[in-house]
């Protein structure tokens, strides 16, 4: 695990090449076909060195949940183990890792009619009014969910309207945890400013590789929009808005880099509270040796 641009892929490839391992991607952007540059998807050369499972498994118009990931990952883990190999799960989508390790609550599926109803209420009265509703039905979730987070706010209210139970109540019951012994590692630079520099450098490389053209091709399909999970991935939203003329090129770069740094900050916040985690420093010599020693 680790924040974006921390060197997870390079270490995973080294591990796969030198030991009897197969890689499973744990990344909510890499699942989408046609989103290669902006998601920092491993190159063809890297995939030849170490194939990644759960990459390119969905169209950007499709949804993919943590429950979908857990089911897919469990199947891949079982298959890799049956081949006499060790699964290596690599990525930065902490919600996926958490779902896999701890199990998931039996939440109801999305209801498009109720979602539309909630959106109409938000359009009429504002998200603050809906947040007040959430405080009445689920004060614990209301403490965690900010009024400016419409996706999570809408989902919490939707769950209550479908089931008659609060999100807090339902999340207290979870499916069985992962039935395997897991050794967990996180990799990140020692200093945050180093990570920030790496993020900026990587985004500039993405632009040189043709990221704007990639987003333009996705936009030209006509069936994608900014409310889809795929198009909410960092970088894609900002580039889409630039192509829509909402701001100039320099502002797009600034906003995309800032959004990526915010993502890295959230990832690090998750990791700092993660139990039983072994830390590695990005770029440090001997990371693979340290990792293998901890796995014995």
From Swiss-Prot:
Region (Interaction with substrate tRNA): 27-30, 151-155, 232-237
Required cofactor names: Mg(2+)
Organism: Shewanella sp. (strain MR-7)
A family per Pfam: IPPT
Binding site for ATP: 2-9
Subunit structure of this chain's protein: Monomer.
Residues reported in the UniProt entry to bind substrate: 4-9
Gene name, Swiss-Prot/TrEMBL: miaA
Entry's EC annotation: 2.5.1.75
GO annotation, biological process: tRNA modification
Function of the protein: Catalyzes the transfer of a dimethylallyl group onto the adenine at position 37 in tRNAs that read codons beginning with uridine, leading to the formation of N6-(dimethylallyl)adenosine (i(6)A).
GO molecular function: ATP binding; tRNA dimethylallyltransferase activity
Name of the protein in question: tRNA dimethylallyltransferase
HAMAP family listed in its UniProt record: IPP_trans
Reaction catalyzed: adenosine(37) in tRNA + dimethylallyl diphosphate = N(6)-dimethylallyladenosine(37) in tRNA + diphosphate
Enzyme class: transferase
Entry keyword Lipid metabolism: no
Family note: Belongs to the IPP transferase family.
Keywords tagged on the record: ATP-binding, Magnesium, Nucleotide-binding, Transferase, tRNA processing
Site residues, Interaction with substrate tRNA: 93, 115
């Amino acid at each position: 695990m680790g924040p974006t641009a921390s060197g997870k892929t390079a270490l995973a490839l080294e591990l796969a090449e030198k030991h009897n391992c197969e890689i499973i991607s744990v990344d909510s952007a890499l699942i989408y076909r046609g989103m290669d540059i902006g998601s920092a998807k491993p190159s063809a050369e890297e995939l030849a060195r170490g194939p990644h499972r759960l990459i390119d498994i969905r169209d950007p118009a499709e949804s993919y949940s943590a429950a979908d990931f857990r089911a897919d990952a469990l199947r891949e883990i079982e298959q890799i183990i049956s081949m006499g190999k060790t699964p290596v799960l690599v990525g930065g989508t902490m919600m996926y890792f958490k779902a896999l390790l701890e199990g998931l609550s039996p939440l109801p599926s999305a209801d498009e009619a109720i979602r539309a109803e909630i959106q109409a209420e938000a359009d009429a009265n504002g998200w603050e009014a809906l947040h007040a509703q959430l405080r009445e039905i689920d004060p614990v979730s209301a403490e965690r969910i900010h009024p400016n987070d419409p996706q999570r706010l809408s989902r919490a209210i939707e769950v209550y309207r479908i089931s008659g139970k609060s999100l807090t109540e339902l999340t207290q019951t979870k499916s069985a945890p992962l039935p395997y012994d897991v050794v967990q590692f996180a990799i990140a630079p020692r200093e945050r400013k180093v990570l920030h520099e790496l993020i900026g450098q990587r985004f500039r490389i993405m632009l040189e590789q043709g990221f704007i053209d990639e987003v333009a091709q996705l936009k030209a399909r006509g069936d994608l929009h900014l409310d889809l999970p795929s198009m909410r991935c960092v970088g894609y939203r900002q580039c889409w808005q630039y192509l829509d003329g909402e701001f100039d090129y320099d502002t797009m770069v600034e906003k995309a880099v800032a959004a990526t740094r915010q993502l890295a900050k959230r990832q690090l916040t998750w990791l700092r509270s993660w139990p039983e985690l072994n830390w590695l420093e990005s770029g440090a010599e001997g990371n693979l040796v340290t990792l293998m020693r901890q796995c014995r």
